[in-house]
Amino acid sequence: MQRNPYSAGAVKFSFWFQEFRKAVFMLADGASLAEIKKFSQETNIFAASSPERAKLIMSNVAKRIDALDPSFVPLFVCSDVVGQKLLCLIACMCTDTLFFDFVNDIIRVKLALGLNEYGDSDARKFWDDKQIQSDKVANLTEATRKRLLSTYKQYLYNAGITEGNAGSRKIIVPIISADIVAWLREHDLQPILVALTGE
């Protein structure tokens, strides 16, 4: 699994499952990413609030798709909505190493210990540890860290990995289909499987 430099870019992002899903189905129908980008600019296929927002969404969706082996497209199309949301989350983890580490350091550890919730104290420890490990994270403002945490919580909730309540959030161990498990292993993404299940 490739590790990218840490980035705080996710403060501008959403889970964008419906947009990701639409783009993947267009790929499955034979369109290229370049054609989808052009179509997005011309017709606002994601119903974005502005051309700038449409460009941001398309750029991020394309980046997530590019991060996965093309064989994920038929897997995505054949999966149920639960599986599709997991694949969207996996794409987020592949493109955002800081988010992957958040899941790996908090969700994986909690599940491995037999615990089924995490809270703000866990997030604070994560940021404290990362500030020691990375100058880039150390230079993030408190406001940026809070916005990143909000984004990460949204990703996990929208993917069905956690509940969405305020305060401590219950962790829901995902039921991952055998096809997705096999695909993750085949493409050296076992660390993501472990991060999401704790085993």
Stretches found by the model and what they are:
Residues 111-118, 136-144:
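Short acidic, glycine/proline-enriched loop segments that cap or flank alpha-helices
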Residues 87-90, 94-116:
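Positively charged, polyanion-binding regions of nucleic-acid-associated proteins
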Residues 12-16, 31-32, 94-100, 126-130:
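Helix-boundary capping/turn motifs
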Residues 119-135:
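DNA-recognition alpha helix
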Residues 138-199:
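Accessory, usually C-terminal, subdomains that scaffold auxiliary metal cofactors
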Residues 1-86:
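Eukaryotic partner-binding/assembly regions in large regulatory complexes
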